[in-house]
Amino acid sequence: MEHEVAWKKYDEVDLEALEGLASNYIDFISENKTERRCAATAIRMAEKAGYISLADAVREGRALSAGDKVWAHSHGKALILVQLGSKPLSKGMNILGAHIDSPRLDLKQNPLYESNGFALLDTHYYGGIKNYQWVTLPLAMHGVIAKKDGTVVDINVGDDEGDPVFCVSDLLIHLASQQMDKKGNKIVEGEDLDILIGNRPISLKGEGAEGECANEGDEGAKDKDAAKEPVKAFALKLLADKYGIEEADFLSAEIEMVPAGRARELGFDRSMVIGYGQDDRVCAYTSLIAQLETPADLAKTAVTVLVDKEEIGSVGATGMASNFFENTIAEIMELAGEGGMLPLRRALSASSMLSSDVSAGFDPAYASVFEPKNAAFLGRGLVFNKYTGARGKSGSNDASAEYVARVRRVMDDAGVSFQTAELGKVDAGGGGTIAYLPAKYGMDVIDSGVAVLSMHAPWEVTSKADIYEAYKGYLAFLKNA
């Protein structure tokens, strides 16, 4: 059974809506390259749509009822949006769940060093990457540095016009005979992914006015360090001048190195999007927009969960494995007059969820790892993965046949183009999502997202048609599941 290309059904109204959504999506992923930025932007968008802080509602003892809209965050890196429906929460919710973290290079806690006239930053890669894809690539620096006095400094270098960028260097082909004989996972080792940030030494006293340092007291010791590592010293001076930070402040920093530059339209026909972090911000954004556009006269409560740490196992306080989701729903039920452990358990088990995560798009350049009858194709709509996992579905959530049938009905009734797929051929590899975690409550969960080419590469590819169908499908699910 072959699914029709979604583009064929669009009229001018559809195309205008599709292009508008794609344009806003390109802006979103270009301007929000970290989980913190995604969460902060989503909160601003939610508040414009009438959402209020759950923390404020709890503090004020405000009762919640049908039509009320609240948001809650965890450490600024995970977010839950809830719009209450007319039915009791204990009758279940319709939930979308996506993640807003993406593979990247994180700075180590003690990252800065000088070597042979270069200042560099040591990194530890985050998530599953092919190390060799990250060399000679313009990189931007995003994140925060928390100082001992309690202030938090935002770092954003490399994406504004006129900003410098950074990179990991590579070995010239003329001397790479041994390197080229290595396996792909050894061509560039993780410890070699160090960021080149400077080559200019500081000017010490007596050597020139710029970058001058004093020679008394503690400053004298700093001068000795600067004389020993002048390029590192100049980098530190620039950081101190711009951000008011010192080297020790890296100990309490979260700084991510990500591909520099905006997402772009791809192809002569502009039918695709190429950009960083589309796994899984393409599903996060479409889920967010669907949640914000959910109509006021909702029967079942609509929920969108945007979580962190999926790429490393959904662990920690901001991952789906934490109690953030459960605790937030408990707080809302208390304010809605449905407090208590038993109503909470009933609400969770009676809920339905789409785990909004991307799927591997069929790539004709690598056709051998796909089984075409059960592969996702760009341009054919929203993808449903009944199960994921690897090696005999290990680690997957396997949605029930009855739930798949119900989701099919919702999509068909809304005119949503969709397809079903596995990640690839049996035993070719595999992967997982957050789906198995909410499923532990007994709720129905199925993976549902957008097909992606070059997944986990610095630049990933999606189809505008699939982005549009994902938005339509997520909205239909929140309204009618």
Task: Provide a role label for each language-model segment.
Residues 1-481:
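N-terminal hydrophobic/helix-forming segments and targeting peptides
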